[in-house]
């Protein structure tokens, strides 16, 4: 029984330490302590009023719960006092340093050594700033790169390479489909009796007609170009008529309205 009481006290101290360590000043604020104290007093009063109705085993468990709550409250109270004492010490140190500086300056005026006192104070401040900055620089330079940070950087680089490779593969496949449409267009025009002065006009006109299709999302681009190549030259392909317009715009007068697809 006594060992269990000691164990619960240690467990409460560990829980309170967790609050103070990871939750900061919010875990030991004055409001939280007051709320916890009210709950503790309420638990004690409730236990005293119901003690006569409880059995022996239930009474022992209630005692243990109260010991745990009291230990937790005492540790939180200790953390709150230490935090307040640290703030008070910092304020006292600041006031002391300010008083010391004012006292030193006034003594210099009385002794007609104002310049020497001012120079001494400025020199000391510069020395403190230089030492602080040099300490920060040396610590940042000598600090090794964390292993986790290097691993994350390598993982991001690998992911970037993988995405770049996938994009390059999709782009290459779409370019092949576009080249297949150029060959298909040349065959269809030849079947309809169209002879172009410059065979490269087919490629130029088709690239102009397919300009907006390259703006499709990368995930849907290959499938979109596959459908275009399959339906190219038919009424189901909405890029054939713009292709004819571009051919005519390039000066191919053999291409006329009868080559459009309804």
Swiss-Prot record:
Gene Ontology cellular component terms for the protein in this record: mitochondrial membrane
UniProt subcellular location: Mitochondrion membrane
Superkingdom to which the source organism belongs: Eukaryota
Organism field: Arabidopsis thaliana (Mouse-ear cress)
Note: A stretch of 270 kb of the mitochondrial genome is duplicated within the centromere of chromosome 2 resulting in the duplication of the gene. The expression of this duplicated gene (At2g07777) is demonstrated.
Membrane topology: Multi-pass membrane protein
Protein name: Uncharacterized mitochondrial protein AtMg01090
Ranges in a coiled coil: 152-181
Annotated InterPro entries: Mt_uS3-like (IPR052694)
Transmembrane segments: 4-24, 28-48, 62-82
């Amino acid at each position: 029984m006594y060992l269990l009481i000691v164990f619960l006290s240690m467990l409460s101290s560990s829980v309170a330490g967790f609050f103070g360590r990871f939750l900061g000043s919010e875990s030991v604020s004055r409001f939280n302590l007051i709320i916890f104290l009210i709950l503790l007093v309420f638990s004690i009063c409730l236990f005293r009023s119901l003690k006569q109705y409880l059995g022996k085993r239930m009474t022992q468990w209630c005692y243990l719960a109260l010991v745990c709550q009291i230990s937790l409250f005492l540790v939180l109270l200790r953390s709150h006092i230490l935090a307040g004492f640290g703030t008070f010490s910092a304020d006292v140190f600041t006031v002391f340093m300010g008083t010391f500086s004012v006292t030193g300056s006034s003594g210099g005026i009385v002794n007609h050594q104002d310049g020497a006192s001012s120079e001494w104070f400025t020199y000391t401040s510069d020395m403190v700033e230089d030492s602080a900055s040099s300490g920060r620089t040396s610590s940042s330079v000598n600090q090794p790169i964390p292993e986790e940070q290097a691993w994350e950087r390598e993982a991001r680089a690998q992911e970037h390479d993988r995405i770049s490779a996938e994009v390059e593969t999709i782009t290459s496949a779409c370019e092949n489909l576009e080249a297949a449409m150029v060959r298909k267009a040349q065959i269809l025009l030849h079947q309809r009796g169209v002879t172009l002065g410059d065979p490269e006009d087919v490629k130029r006109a088709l690239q102009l007609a397919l300009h907006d299709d390259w703006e499709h999302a990368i995930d849907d681009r290959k499938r979109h170009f596959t459908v275009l190549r399959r339906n190219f030259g038919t009424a189901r392909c909405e890029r054939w008529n713009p292709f004819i317009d571009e051919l005519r715009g390039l000066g191919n007068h053999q291409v006329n309205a009868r080559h459009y697809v309804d």
